[in-house]
Amino acid sequence: GYTLDEITNDVTGKTCACFEPALDYIVVKYPKWPFDKFVYADKSLGTQMMATGEVMSIGNSFEAAMMKAVSSIELGMDTLTHKPFEELTDDEIVAHLYVQDAERVFCVYEALKRGIDHETIWKITKIDWWFLDKMQHLADLEKGLAKCNGVLSLEQYQTAKKYGFQDKTIKRLAQVDALPVENYRAGFKMVDTCAAEFSANTPYFYSTYDGDNEAAEFIAAKEAEAAANGQPKKKKVLVFGSGPIRIGQGIEFDYCSVHCVWTLKNHGCEAILVNNNPETVSTDFDTGDRLYFDPLNPESVDNIIATEKPDACVVQFGGQTAIKLAKHMDEIGLPILGTPADAIDEAEDRERFDELLERCKIPRAPGRTVFNLEEALAAADEIGLPVLMRPSYVLGGQNMIVAYTKADVIEYMGVITEHVDMDHPVLLDKYIMGTECEVDAICDGENFLIPGIMEQVERTGVHSGDSICVYPAQHLTQAEIDTIVDYTGRFARELHVTGLVNVQYAVSNGKVYVIEVNPRSSRTVPYISKVTGVPMVDLAVRCCLGEKLADMGYGTGLHPNAPYVAVKVPVFSFEKLHGVDTQFGPEMKSTGEVLGIAPNYHDALLKGLIGAGYTFKTPGPASCCIFTVKDSDKPEFVDIAWKLKSMGYKLYGTSGTCAWLNKHMVPCNEVRNMSGESPNIVDLLQSGLVDYVFSTSAKGRDPKRDSVRLRRKAVELSIPCITAVDTANALVDCLRSDHDLKNIPLVDIATLYHKK
C-alpha cells in the first residue's frame, strides 16, 4: 500500500523511489550459450531461449561495455573478431549475415571490418544503425592498431584503453613489446542511478579510463570515518565470483561465494566482491562491503587491486573461473587465503599429479598426456581402449569423451583442438568401469572433515553432474569407505589444503581408484551442506582465516550419517537445444538439479525423479517401450525388459536388441530403424503408444547418426528417453514399487541446522 514517494531508494539512501533514474553509463547484457560444450548443436536462435546464463558489463560508452562483455563471456576472445569468419570471403560473410545464430554479432563485426556498407548489413539483419556505428568505431580502432607495425603512439594507446581494449590485445594487434605507459590503471565510477547528482551509499563500481576514481574517494572517506570513530582497520579480502552461469559451473558457486562473504564479514574482514553476472546474489549491491562489476581477467583484477590494496584474496569458491586467476595472484604477490596456487597447479598438472599419487601411494587408472593426434593414438595403443579423453583445466567435463575406437580418438582430437587452447595438454586415462563416489572435505592444513560420502547411481563414464547422486552411499563396503576416508586425508595433507577439496573416486572390484582431485569448492557443496547440516563454506573460510576444525564443534574425519537418504537428480533442457545428443557421457549436459529426501533410498529416489520431471505411467492395453542398446549393455537390459514386460508393456527393439531379448526369453517385437522403410521406429514413436525409450549407443554426438536422431525425436515428442543402464534400473524399480508420494513422510531440512 505504500506510494513510490514513501519508499526510499536504497541505492542513494536520499532520494525516493519515484525519482527518475539518471544514468551516466551504458550497460550491456550478453547471453552465455552452451555451444562451446555442444559442438554439434544447432546454434540458430529464435523464440525458444537457449542461453544458460549471461554476463553484464558497465562502461561509459557502448564500445567499452561491449568489449568488457566479450571478455567476460569466456569464449577465449578479447575483441569481436571471431577467427572462423576471418577465413571467409566477402560473399560468404554477406551470406552468413542471413543466419540468426549465436555468432551473428561477430559476423556483423567482420562485415564492418571488411568495409561492407551499413545499408547492406541493416537490410539483412535489421540491427539498428546506432549499434552498427558503434561497432564500426570498434572495428576502425582494431584496424588502426593493426596498422601500427610496431610503433604505437600514446594517443592511440589511450584511445584504445578508453574503448575497452586490454593491454595484451593492444600489444598483439600493434605488434609491440612495450606500451607507451606501463601499468596504466583504470579508475572506478559508482553505480548511483542519479549521475552523481546526489552522493550515494552503494559501494558498487565499474572501471573507466576517464581519469576519475570514485572508488578510491569512497574508500578513503570510509577509512577516515572509521579512524575518527576509533575503529581498528579491517583486513581486506578480495573474493572472486564465478562469472556467467553455464553447464558445469552454475549457481552452486554463487552459493559458495556469498556464504564466503558472509563468513568473512562475520569475522571482522572487509569482503570485496568481483563478478560480472547480474543473475547472482553475489552481485547484489549490499552483499559484500564493495562490489566491482568487471570482467574476471588478470588486467581487470589488477586495476581493482591497485585501487583497493587488499590484504589477501580467495579463489576457491568461484569455480574454474576464479581458479584460473590463482597463478596470476601468486605472480603479483597477493596472498591467497587457503590452498596455495602451487597446490592447485599440482592437482591440475598431469605429471605433477602422478608424482603426488606416487608419494601418497594411491592407485589411479594409467594415463598419458598428449599434445597432438599422433601422440594420442600412440597413447591409446599403449594404455588400451577404451580411454577417457579430456583437456586439462576444465570444469563440467567440457569436451570430455570416452573413446572406444581409434576413429573416436581421431574425431575427438579434432573437436578438442578446435575448441581448446592447446597450451594445455589433452589427458588420456584408461576407462575403468565401476561405481563412482565423490567426497567434499574441509581441511585446516592438518585435520580434515568429510560431511558425507556421495555415491553416483550411474557408473563411471557418466559425468558426476549428470548422474543421480545419493547420500549416504548405499553400496560401499566398510573397507571401501575406510579407504576413501584414508585417501582423502592423504591428499589433504600432501597438498596442504586449507579450505575445501573435492575428490572423485572409482570403486571397482573392491579397489578404490582416484579419478581427480580439485582443491576448491565443487557443485555438490550446497547439496551436501544442506543434507548433512554441516555449513561447509563457513567452516572452510574459518580454516582459511587460521581456525582449527577441532575447535569448531563438528569433529574431524567422517561425519556420522544422517538418519535419512537424500537423492540429487539432474534436470536437463534438451527440448531447448536442438541437435544435442541426449545420451549421458563424461561431458556434463544437465542445467539444474532437484533434491529428494526420505527415510529410505527408494522413497527418496521416487521424490527426486518426480521432482526432475520423470513421469510414472500405468501401462494401458497397447502401451509399449522401445529398446535399442549397445552390445555391452544388452546383458543388463534383459532384467529391465523382463520387469517391464511383467508390468504389461509390449516391447519393441531394433534388430540386434530384439534378437538378444528373444534369445533370453523376453518376448520382443522387431521395429525398423529410423533409416529403414516405413513403418519404422519413427511411426511407432508418433503413434502415441510409446511410454518409454531405452537407448544406449557406442557412438554418439553426431546428429546424423540414427541413434542420436532417435533420442532427439523422443525429446521432441516428450517421451522419456533413458540413456544409461543405472538410470533405467532406478526408474523401473520405482515404476514397480507400490510407493506413492502421499505415503512418504516429509523430512524437515530446516531442523538440520543448529548453531555450533
Describe the predicted segments one by one:
Residues 378-388:
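Acidic/histidine-enriched active-site and ligand-binding environments that engage anionic O-linkages
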Residues 1-144, 148-155, 163-164, 221-223, ...:
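ATP-dependent carboxylate activation and anion-phosphoryl transfer catalytic cores
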Residues 124-132, 172-182:
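Short, basic interhelical loop/turn and adjoining N-cap
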Residues 119, 158, 172, 666-668:
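Compact, charge-rich alpha-helical regulatory domains located at protein termini
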Residues 160-163, 169, 173:
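Extended, domain-scale alpha-helical bundle/helix-rich regions
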